[in-house]
């Protein structure tokens, strides 16, 4: 486990050594980027410019929540929803989606960096991200999903040797609020990797609502490592007396220590039935709801 009393000053010194001037950070509101933001602010103060990109692929209410939490950090918010959705048109391959999101993400940051004359980028890459990218399991938008040519002088990754549970320890030591310290992992490419096949605005809207329902039903009571819903295709259903061809939603809830391995939670039947009833009842275009029992390995936690 990480020794936070040593890690924190070492990370601050590392940022001071690498960031030589205006530096931007990709702030998502997750524990990884939030820890990096606090460390960076302690290291370089007003040379840090936190930027949040609204990709249109975030969870329900997430953008508004992030604006509230980080209002005192001079947070700059960029509305890039149309840009990301346009870039994803026609793309079905999971790795291509990740790379498109990563490239669009970094290009938006480059544009902002030029506006403010920033030459360095801080990112919240953690150790499992590097393992999965280096091992060819999947690229991460802030690791293997980045374009080969980046216009920054350097990318700084202060927590790239930590596992998720260690990042949470550092977050508590930095006095970050519990909402951030215990925030559930969320993939860098956002809801795009919770949609099998091409990403469309309709699918994003469906999976966003389904995710919100799953989180409402499971987070507080069962405290999963990660839980979410994914749109995995279309299937036949019946709404009233009418035959429909609607979306199939897969629900995922896993327990884990560090994200490297995971087991599906054994949820009560009544809970699963309630989730199914809410999703199919509140989202008119959904025809079927499934529960994924796959462990990691052989599956990954996310569907893509």
Swiss-Prot record:
Q: Does the keyword Ligase apply?
A: yes
Cellular compartments per GO CC: cytosol
List UniProt keywords, sorted A-Z. ATP-binding, GMP biosynthesis, Ligase, Nucleotide-binding, Purine biosynthesis
Q: Which GO terms describe its molecular function?
A: ATP binding; GMP synthase activity
Enzyme class of the recorded protein, top EC level: ligase
**Cross-referenced InterPro entries:** GMP_synth_C, GMP_synthase_B, GMPS_ATP_PPase_dom, NAD/GMP_synthase, Rossmann-like_a/b/a_fold
Q: Which residues form the GMPS ATP-PPase domain?
A: 2-183
| SUBUNIT field | Heterodimer composed of a glutamine amidotransferase subunit (A) and a GMP-binding subunit (B).
> Mind telling me what this protein is named?
GMP synthase [glutamine-hydrolyzing] subunit B
Q: Give the species.
A: Methanococcoides burtonii (strain DSM 6242 / NBRC 107633 / OCM 468 / ACE-M)
Write the gene name.
guaAB
